[in-house]
Design a protein with these regions (language model features):
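Short acidic/glycine-rich loops and adjacent helix/strand connectors
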Residues: 1-170
């Protein structure tokens, strides 16, 4: 059985397991030269596909190691990779402090800062702004669907082969 494991959060990475043995594992930051790379590990996955001559024909499962996908800002914008210390401090005061204290907060704060300061960054998961207002369960379902579509397209693999697992138990 051939399984490609993918972690698309902070320190994103991909690994290859053949018949239960890990043959290769690589973090995206090794290929992009950006510490704490976040998001889908495009270059790491491409490396595995090319190096081991993998395709839809011989891959059994693509194991995505994050189940909970409701925080749009978290999945859409690789802020851990590109934000400066000052960006993070501003975000704590302008976004997280009011949000966590139950006050009004700017839902599009991270999007606005990210798109203004980092317009060259590629965003793989195309999540509509309207999803911010969806109930959690519906948002989870829709973001998971967007993830499956994006992963299927970038890897040229059947959607039915893409599965989600709790990253704490992988």
């Amino acid at each position: 059985m051939i399984v490609i494991g993918i972690y698309d959060d902070h320190n994103s990475s991909a690994c290859l397991s053949i018949n239960g043995e890990i043959v290769c594992a690589i973090q995206e930051e090794r290929l992009t030269k950006r510490k704490n790379e976040k998001g889908f590990p495009v270059k790491a996955v491409k490396y595995l596909l090319d190096e081991y001559q993998l395709s839809n024909d011989n891959i059994d499962i693509v194991a995505m190691s994050t189940i909970e996908r409701t925080d749009i800002n978290h999945f859409k914008y690789p802020i851990d990779t590109v934000f400066s210390v000052n960006d993070h401090l501003d975000m704590m005061n302008c976004y997280w402090k009011p949000k966590l204290s139950g006050k009004e907060y700017p839902k599009h704060y991270i999007k606005d800062i990210f798109e203004k300061k980092y317009p060259q960054e590629n965003i793989l998961y195309k999540i509509p702004d309207s999803y911010y207002d969806l109930p959690v369960e519906e948002r989870q379902e829709k973001i998971t669907s967007i993830t499956i579509d994006a992963v299927s397209k970038i890897m040229d693999i059947d959607k039915s082969k893409i599965k989600f697992y709790d990253h704490h138990t992988c």
